[in-house]
Amino acid sequence: EVEVTIIDMQSPASHASLATFAWINASWAKQPQAYHALNQKSVGYWHELSKQIGVPIKWGGSLEWFKSSDRQKKLGLQIREQIGWGEAAEILPVASAKMLEPNVTFMGADNVAYSANDGAVDPSEATKKLLSAAQANGAKVIYPCNLNGIAKTLDGEFADTTCGSIPFDQIVLAVGAASKTIASIAKLNIPQRSTPGIIVVTEPTEPLLNRIVVAPGVHIHQRFDGRIVVGEQTGAPKTPAHNSRLKGRPNQYPNQVLAQDHAQRILDLAIKYVPRLTSVKADEILIGWRPLPLDGHPVLGYSSEEPSVYIAVSHSGITLAPIIGRLVAKELIEKRPLEVLNAYRPNRDFITVVRY
């Protein structure tokens, strides 16, 4: 019998998992083919989870285009590769895209990439459903509870936490961008960047979008409850003022005026492509610090310095969550490495640098 205890330093889905665009996809960006296949399989597992525990996922695909003609040509080649890899992807004329999303202008598009298998999820609701299912199977969920370190005694290993000492055989660090935690607990330095992802969530509005819209500079989708989710693609400007403001990785703006200014700026990007958003008001503006391993791939495996500590860090965390959960659990329980995860071990060479 396996006993599982889950701790969270604040509360579930309160950091990057809350402030994510939550696009489920196996897109052209998922390279090479083996990594793309991992994403494809995980998209399929999301369908299973939706049926098993009632995670509300809005399927319908994504529509994507770029501003420059050169980038559009490259997108056409990438979609051709996607088709060869088994994806339901195609290039549509704008008129056909308009039939799918009549409220989108498709400004600047000659044609549009349509990836029919994509979907989007409310990450907070998904996290709650997953934790409830885990608890129904006997898992303990404790928060707020921070991991301070590991104590090794004659009676075994114990997690030293702010909510007491917890005995363990194996511990999984699913800590996202908290690289200092990995360094202190796992005794490893994982080469990664971490940049802030800015997400605006609006007040509920009338049904406007059926699919994910990935337009130049901005991505947009609408949840079942009517809220529009908008993310900017370029990120914060590299100015001294912004660098100072982002020091310490804040999860919110220093004041409401600044937050509303940024929310409106991001909404204005979306309004260019969905004009009917003009009267919609922002409800939340979220800052999420994304874990970005330098080569663009997850970090999954035991620490070479602390054999009982397993690291599980991933960009594309939403898409990959179901398959990472399954495969990591299998490695932990069976105590044997799975070949499919060998490319993502913590001790690999992070040679290729991928910019997100």
Name what the model sees in each region:
Residues 2-19:
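Glycine-rich FAD pyrophosphate-binding loop
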Residues 8, 59, 92-94, 143-145, ...:
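Short loop/edge segments at beta-strand edges and connector loops
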Residues 22-100, 217-219, 250, 254-257, ...:
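Dinucleotide-binding Rossmann-like beta1-alpha1 core, especially the glycine-rich loop
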Residues 112-132, 176-178, 262-269, 313-314, ...:
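Mid-domain beta-loop-alpha active-site segment that forms a flexible
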Residues 113-170:
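Helical element adjacent to the flavin cofactor pocket in flavoenzyme catalytic cores
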Residues 123, 265-356:
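C-terminal catalytic lobe of FAD-dependent flavoproteins
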Residues 165-210, 339:
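Central helical "cap/lid" subdomain
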Residues 206-306:
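Active-site lid/adjacent beta-loop-alpha segment flanking the redox-cofactor pocket in flavoenzymes
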